[in-house]
Amino acid sequence: MKRTFQPSKIRRKRTHGFRARMATKNGRKVLAARRRKGRKALIP
């Protein structure tokens, strides 16, 4: 059985990147929540 995590920089950026977050209303809510909490990095 293969491992489930097959890293890809492109896929990571496209699904979890800053622009992906900004593209949807809920994504912007995520960023706002992370700013409110005082996260050092908004995008992991």
Curated annotation (Swiss-Prot):
- Would the keyword Transport turn up in this protein's UniProt record? no
Do you know which InterPro entries this protein is assigned to? Ribosomal_bL34 (IPR000271), Ribosomal_bL34_CS (IPR020939)
- Name the UniProt key words of this record, in alphabetical order: Ribonucleoprotein, Ribosomal protein
User: Is Metal-binding included in the keywords of this UniProt record?
Assistant: no
The disulfide bonds in this chain are: none
| Family of this protein | Belongs to the bacterial ribosomal protein bL34 family.
Give the protein's recorded name. Large ribosomal subunit protein bL34
What is the protein's species of origin? Magnetococcus marinus (strain ATCC BAA-1437 / JCM 17883 / MC-1)
The record's gene field reads: rpmH
